[in-house]
């Protein structure tokens, strides 16, 4: 294998592939990137056995072939080469990398040792605008669990029905539901539980590439996302999470006893200030009384904080407590100037939303001691 390519273009693609390289696998070849040069095109692959990434470059190929290079070292070498065309040539057990007067020889692996976990098949694909996809995940994905002991909760339930994209995530302490209208309508309903990590990589790359579409294919056990770019296309493939996603509709109350509308900026600023004293798992307390919300935090051996906000509230006073981080993340997801808070009782979940109904954030309360 031997090919020549632009250094900057190769650096960019290696940066994309790095997100799929395994850093803690017992299989050394997974710390590498597979290079396949064939008929004027270079394909690059990386996988950690759950997430796989493919990228390509159009570049002169002198000799077809394939080799697996150590991802981090190869990337560092290419990044630090002179700003000239890079020549990569594979031998039996090493790959030569050169540009200008600089030359390197790196140990490599045979391509046959690299596991191909995805064919990046786009059968039955459909397109979703990058901007609505990013906006939907940014709101819903924040509620997904990062705890691998319950794999189903590390996924996002993604549904596309008609012209609506819906994403749902929960870590059992909070629940986020976001619906977004699409420019195109799908004839059949598509639903899958996709790891939040994979969706995060898709949105990160989509944000970097700018406006356009994401082509999506949902197979029996994997999802593939393709992002087209003049500099070379990128595919991200992820396994789907098996199992039954929690029946989130049962968790959403039909009615609430209290509804309060608060200026989002004021609520965020107050919550952030007061929560500075909500340490060591201490709750952020919200005490509602006639036309007033008082936010409090108390941590033994640290101190306490309190701040009041004028609100339109009437009825029996009550106090409810929340994890401060979860509360702030919910309010932060609201785009409108006003935030709507709904409650039933101090021991029932609270609901955060904007004036519209396309985003819902349910948060479990913390039982308060007197």
Language model features: what each stretch is:
Residues 1-370:
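Structural preference for solvent-exposed beta-strand-turn elements
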């Amino acid at each position: 294998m031997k090919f020549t390519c632009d250094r900057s273009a190769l650096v960019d693609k290696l940066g994309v592939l790095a997100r799929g390289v395994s850093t803690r696998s017992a299989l050394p070849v997974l710390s590498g990137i597979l290079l396949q040069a064939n008929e004027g095109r270079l394909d690059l692959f990386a996988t950690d056995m759950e997430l796989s990434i493919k990228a390509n470059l159009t570049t002169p190929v002198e000799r077809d072939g394939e080799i697996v290079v150590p991802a981090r070292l190869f990337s560092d070498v290419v990044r630090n080469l002179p700003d000239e065309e890079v020549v990569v040539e594979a031998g039996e057990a090493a790959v030569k990398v050169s540009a200008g007067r600089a030359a390197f020889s790196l140990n490599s692996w045979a391509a046959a040792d690299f596991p191909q976990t995805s064919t990046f098949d786009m059968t039955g694909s459909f397109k979703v605008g990058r901007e609505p996809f990013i906006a939907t995940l940014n709101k819903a994905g924040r509620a997904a669990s990062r705890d691998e002991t319950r794999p189903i909760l590390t996924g996002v339930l993604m549904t596309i029905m008609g012209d609506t994209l819906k994403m749902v995530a929960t870590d059992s302490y909070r629940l986020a539901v976001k619906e977004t209208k699409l420019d195109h309508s799908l004839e059949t309903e598509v639903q899958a539980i996709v790891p939040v990590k994979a969706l995060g990589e898709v949105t990160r790359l989509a944000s970097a590439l700018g406006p356009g579409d994401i082509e999506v294919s949902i197979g029996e056990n994997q999802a593939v996302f393709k992002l087209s770019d003049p500099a070379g296309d990128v595919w991200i493939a992820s396994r789907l999470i098996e199992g039954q996603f929690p029946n989130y509709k049962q968790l959403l109350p039909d009615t609430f006893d209290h509804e309060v509308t608060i200026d989002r900026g004021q609520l965020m600023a107050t919550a952030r200030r007061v929560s500075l004293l909500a340490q060591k798992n201490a709750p952020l307390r919200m005490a509602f009384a006639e036309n007033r919300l008082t936010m409090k935090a108390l941590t033994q051996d640290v101190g306490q904080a309190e701040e009041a906000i004028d609100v339109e509230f009437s009825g029996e006073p009550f106090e409810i407590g929340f994890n401060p981080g979860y509360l702030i993340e919910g309010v932060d997801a609201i785009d409108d100037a006003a935030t709507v808070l709904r409650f039933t009782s101090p021991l029932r979940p609270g609901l955060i939303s904007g004036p519209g109904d396309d985003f819902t954030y349910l948060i479990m309360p913390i039982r308060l001691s007197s």
